[in-house]
Structure formats: structure tokens, C-alpha cells
Swiss-Prot record:
NCBIfam families: PRK13627.1. This is Carnitine operon protein CaiE. The keyword Repeat applies. CDD domains: LbH_paaY_like. GO terms for molecular function: transferase activity. Belongs to the transferase hexapeptide repeat family. GO terms for biological process: carnitine metabolic process. Keywords: Repeat, Transferase. Pfam families: Hexapep. The keyword Transmembrane does not apply. It comes from the Bacteria.
Amino acid sequence: MSYYAFEGLIPVVHPDAFVHPSAVLIGDVIVGAGVYIGPLASLRGDYGRQILEAGSNLQDGCIMHGYCDTDTIVHENGHIGHGAILHGCVVGRDALVGMNSVIMDGAVIGEESIVAAMSFVKAGFQGEARQLLVGSPARVLRQVTDQELHWKRLNTKEYQDLAIRCRTGLSETKPLTQVEENRPRLKGTTDVKPKSAQ
């Protein structure tokens, strides 16, 4: 893991969290229990504080940063998709930020909300609970349905379980030179499917 102290502040990581070895945590970073941090994620606590609360996930290539005297927060069970950027914002409890979305300074994503992939949430946006945000700039399309929230929670559960699985089942290795016979497939822990397959 790449952990760096910055001007005396050292990242804090709960022992039940999983941080991929290629992720970088700098300075004022606080990571809660059961959190999953994916490959190449960057949490730069060299200005503002970066907080991932219990059960949340920050996937591959995500960035968290913010100005001095600000907190960038992903609340409990928050779900941050591949390549998303969070800058000085707050993501509410049980909310999802889709892949390659950008959430700007002072924005608040309401609890149980979903930000669609590739969306841009402008600075200062003040969201409410269970909003579906879409587009660039993002607008409120409608309320999140019970089915969509259930789908989100299954995905988050997969990442909470993945944090546990990675702590024991992930190891650096050398590649094989050919595919072995009867190569097995990996299984998740829920019955979640891509939205297009539902």
C-alpha cells in the first residue's frame, strides 16, 4: 500500500478495510470499517480531509480531493463507481455515484440517490434524498425507485464482501502462459445483474 504522511498527518485505515496496493492515501484521510478501495484510487488529504465511512467503496481510478478546511465525505454504504472524481463534496448514506462522474465542491448528493454514469454535478448543488441525477450538467430526472435502490444495495453488498475476500484471497503472482483446462469462473455473493440484463 502507498500511505504517505503529510505535514504530520497520517492516513487512518480501519483494520477491516481493504486498500489495494496500488492505491495512494496521502495525509488527512480517514477510512472506516469494511471499506473497499480499488486499484489506482487516489485519496489526497494534502489540503482538505477525505473520509470514507463504514461499508462504502471507492473503485478503480477514483480521485478524492478538496480545498483546505473542507471535508470530502462518502457516508456509510456510499458507492463510488470506476473513475469518478469527488472534489470537496458530500455523498449521502447509501448513495451511488456512477462511473466517470464528477461531483464538484460544496455539492451534496442526498442519501439513497443515484448519479448516473458520466454525469457532472456542479459546485454547490444541494440534493435531496432518493434523487436520480443525470447528465452534464446533472439535473434531477426523477425519484429513485425501490427496485433501483435494491439493485444499488446488492452492488454495494458485493463490494463489502469483496473487501473481505481480497484481504484473504488476493495475492501478487506471475501470469500463466496458457489457459488451463476447465478454468473456473469466479462468483459473487449476491444475485445482482447488470441493469441491461434485468
